Amino acid sequence: MAIRSYRTYTPSTRNRPISSYDGRVRSNPQKKLTSGQHRCGKGRNSRGIITARHRGGGHKRLYRQIDFQRNEKYIFGEIVTIEYDPNRSAYICLVHYGDGEKKYILHPRGVIIGDTITSGPRAPISIGNALPLTDVPLGTAIHSIEITLGKGGQLARAAGAVAELIAKEGRSTTLRLPSGEIRLISENCSATIGQVGNVNANNGTLGKAGSKRWLGKRPRVRGVVMNPVDHPHGGGEGRTPIGRKKPVTPWGYAALGRKSRKNNKYSDASILRRRK
């Protein structure tokens, strides 16, 4: 989708670029493919304690049930609509399959209404088709990649995301992920050909604080203006420094350059090169 700018009629619209929604993108989903979401206590756990900071509020949403597993093997489906999904940055497509099933999938870049897609081993190498990695040629752009066989696509699902198949050896394939990480995936895991659509999703600007509140994101307060009980940087009279050699997190860990990934994770053996 293209980027357009608002005319300046309020301060929040001055020079504000956003993704333009053309007439093909709809916002009224299929009722049978949606479900409600329990949004009480956003960012809290079952005891009401904040586990994810700066979350809360936001507009009500219906969850669109996305088919990440692509179980309709060897059945052709037609792209009927391209729709907006408030729960993700990418657009979604409504697919009508030949057996009468209707399912949502992520919108691959370049797929238009009326196109036909399919899935399964030895499916054609065309955009939108899903097939095992063992049948994908080297150098192919893919997205919605399985990590565990049968669990459905988990990698490269955001708007504009694309991974590359760079090697095959034994029962494993080597992928270069959007983060720059290079990791091994079983050759039996499936992936979808092409790149996720809405590549300009990150080129827009929110323009005002209220737009961020609509997304369920609350303000981020600097630690230096808090009290000592709330943050290690807090306290002091007026504009005082943090009182430490290096910045730290609210829990006292180094804030700059410290690796947050846990040691000895089960997936360490599959990662050949860490992300950038």
Swiss-Prot record:
GO cellular component, one term: chloroplast
Pfam families, sorted: Ribosomal_L2, Ribosomal_L2_C
SUPFAM superfamilies: Nucleic acid-binding proteins, Translation proteins SH3-like domain
GO terms under biological process: mitochondrial translation
Biased segments, Polar residues type: 7-18, 27-37
Cellular localization per UniProt: Plastid, Chloroplast
Signal peptide feature range: none
Annotated spans, Disordered: 1-51, 224-276
Key words of the record: Chloroplast, Plastid, Ribonucleoprotein, Ribosomal protein
Keyword hit for Ribonucleoprotein: yes
Family annotation (InterPro entries): NA-bd_OB-fold, Rib_uL2_dom2, Ribosomal_uL2, Ribosomal_uL2_bac/org-type, Ribosomal_uL2_C, Ribosomal_uL2_CS, Ribosomal_uL2_dom3, Ribosomal_uL2_RNA-bd_dom
Gene Ontology MF term list: rRNA binding; structural constituent of ribosome; transferase activity
Subunit structure: Part of the 50S ribosomal subunit.
Family (UniProt): Belongs to the universal ribosomal protein uL2 family.
Name of the protein in its database record: Large ribosomal subunit protein uL2c
